[in-house]
Amino acid sequence: MVVSAGPWSSEKAEMNILEINEKLRPQLAENKQQFRNLKERCFLTQLAGFLANRQKKYKYEECKDLIKFMLRNERQFKEEKLAEQLKQAEELRQYKVLVHSQERELTQLREKLREGRDASRSLNEHLQALLTPDEPDKSQGQDLQEQLAEGCRLAQHLVQKLSPENDEDEDEDVQVEEDEKVLESSAPREVQKAEESKVPEDSLEECAITCSNSHGPCDSIQPHKNIKITFEEDKVNSSLVVDRESSHDGCQDALNILPVPGPTSSATNVSMVVSAGPLSSEKAEMNILEINEKLCPQLAEKKQQFRSLKEKCFVTQVACFLAKQQNKYKYEECKDLIKSMLRNERQFKEEKLAEQLKQAEELRQYKVLVHSQERELTQLREKLREGRDASRSLNEHLQALLTPDEPDKSQGQDLQEQLAEGCRLAQHLVQKLSPENDNDDDEDVQVEVAEKVQKSSSPREMQKAEEKEVPEDSLEECAITCSNSHGPYDSNQPHRKTKITFEEDKVDSTLIGSSSHVEWEDAVHIIPENESDDEEEEEKGPVSPRNLQESEEEEVPQESWDEGYSTLSIPPERLASYQSYSSTFHSLEEQQVCMAVDIGRHRWDQVKKEDQEATGPRLSRELLDEKEPEVLQDSLDRCYSTPSVYLGLTDSCQPYRSAFYVLEQQRIGLAVDMDEIEKYQEVEEDQDPSCPRLSRELLAEKEPEVLQDSLDRCYSTPSGYLELPDLGQPYRSAVYSLEEQYLGLALDVDRIKKDQEEEEDQGPPCPRLSRELLEVVEPEVLQDSLDVIQLLPVVLNSLTPASPTEVPFMHWRKNMLAFLLTWEKLKRRGRGRKEGEEDQRRKEEGEEKKGKKIKTHHAPGSAAC
């Protein structure tokens, strides 16, 4: 019976095939992997066989040493790498341990500093409360003793907080004894400390003598420092370092004997050579030994070269074998295997290198951290040391204050001074224990504490402190009050040395002074800070006010002279009663020079403009009239700034200040009036140039009115001097005579100008002859004015000063004469230039008229022709 295969049977067959395939695929992969492993093993077997054949061929016994040497070098290299890694790991571990220990120590030191700061602040507050009590009865008797005992207890607590941990147990007994002695207050603290400090020194000396086996005793007076003792016997070096750590109370000393690494003891090696032959045989042996010693390095070098050649040959043979095997076993099939091996090796090397770099970076970071922590530890240890020293000194001071030798000194002013010294030591301690970033926060507290201490101290110290702590606002108010004061003061008050330098909107002043009416060193300095060379000037030394003013005048431009000339300076070598007068005349001389320069500059600008604009005289004069007030305003501002100098005079110069003020006003008014007269004349000439005689007559009629006003001002000047008291009698007469001569000179100048104008108004028909006559007559007229000017010094020199204080007035007169002479010269120069221009213009007009006449003569003749 035959059964035909149906669809169900075919489907089952397909499912079976798929299942079989799925089962056989892992087996196929496994077989492939086994085949690759077999290939690798075969390859290695062939390589081993090749090496064995080569070794047999090249006599393996000869190459055995070379193979061992190569293997030994490779092993040594691996061991060195491993040792280096272990060394780095150990060093890293040590640094980690060191960092953690330093962190713990830093935390402890910071905590100790914080506790010390709190204790020092509480002690400072306690001392401040003790120094400035609310009820004065509590500062005497038993209450004072109890409060001082509390202060000593706080100071001891502070010393305990600042002491290291290893000294706390050692200081407990000493502190208990000190507490008992403080309460009993039987003996001074200094004597007790001297007795306590002798005992550990003697024990230390005995210990040092026992340890070092020294033959002589040490000097007990010398301080104990780090002692280093070295014994040398038969080339044996042993070192002991005796480290003395003194306790913070100065009463206990500890000895730490630390071993210092050095060479171990070893017996002396003695080599004896017994000669058995004559001397010649010994010499021959010595020569042979020397030759052998010389040839040994050469032999070793040759052996090394031979080994290197063998290695190169062996490597070449292995490379040749690998190339043949790759060709034999189809290099393409083994290519993936070789690449994977090389890739794994490279990856392994990169991982090793990355790990080494990571360890090196971590080690570097730890080193940096260790160094920074070492620096911080050094700073904190130094701060703790300074704090301990300050706390000890404060403790000793309080102990001495609590147990005085003389009971009378513990009351009254001496007690206050001692308490103030204790407060100062406490403040110094707080400052030492405060970190650098907390210094700014503690400044306000220190200032308040200093004010409290100074209030309770002597009046002299309080006055000095107030003068040092005056702010800039109060300084400016003081300067304004001094400069604006006009009321009379007592002239019998002693004159102090005063150095004041004013600068507009550029002065940032600092007041330094001391209240002393007898010493010459009590002075008020107002020092400018706006210059960039202040530090260099301070290094060079103090600069005199005169030199300072001259340097400022050189640097300041022309427009800022009004600031520089308002400076009041006083030489330090003059007397106090004479300084105020000399400073006043010094500034007055500078104002006169400034005014003369301004007038000369104004005249010179006027002459230049007339030269440039000779073709349009009316237009040029109108422009000049418009521009003149600006130029004159500058000079007038400088002139009117002169009286501000007189406000800085001292009390004894108060009567003269008003007189100089009036005189300066009259002189400025006269100068302004003369400028107005000249401008008025120029305007009249411009308005009507065709009729000069009529305009000049009108001007002559109007001039007396204007001049009368100026003369009234001038003659009203001496009235200001009549108000001077009897103290200024000699100065009043001198100034009065000077004013009369000054007015006479002004009248002479006006009369000369009038005569010149009258001669010009006559208008002679021949201009050439008139010019020659003018040149002849003019020197006589000017000679008259010069005679008047030259007579003034004779009159002034005849007035001898009645007292030394009249010398400044004589200087002022001479400067006034110099100013007048300069003014007259400038006027003559301007007038001569103006007349020359007028002559040139007249010549040009005459030539034009002649040309017109010639043209008119030729014109009728040509018409007739």
Curated annotation (Swiss-Prot):
Identify this protein by name: NBPF family member NBPF11
Q: Where is the composition biased (Basic and acidic residues)?
A: 190-200, 833-850
Q: Which GO terms describe its cellular component?
A: cytoplasm
* Family according to the record: Belongs to the NBPF family.
Domain Olduvai span(s) in chain numbering: 165-259, 436-528, 529-617, 620-675, 676-767, 770-865
Leftover remarks: Encoded by one of the numerous copies of NBPF genes clustered in the p36, p12 and q21 region of the chromosome 1.
Q: Which domain of life is it from?
A: Eukaryota
Keywords (A to Z) from UniProt: Coiled coil, Cytoplasm, Repeat
Ranges in coiled-coil conformation = 70-130, 339-401
Organism phylogeny: Eukaryota, Metazoa, Chordata, Craniata, Vertebrata
Instruction: Name the gene behind this protein.
Output: NBPF11
Q: Which Pfam families match?
A: Olduvai
Q: Where is this gene product found?
A: Cytoplasm
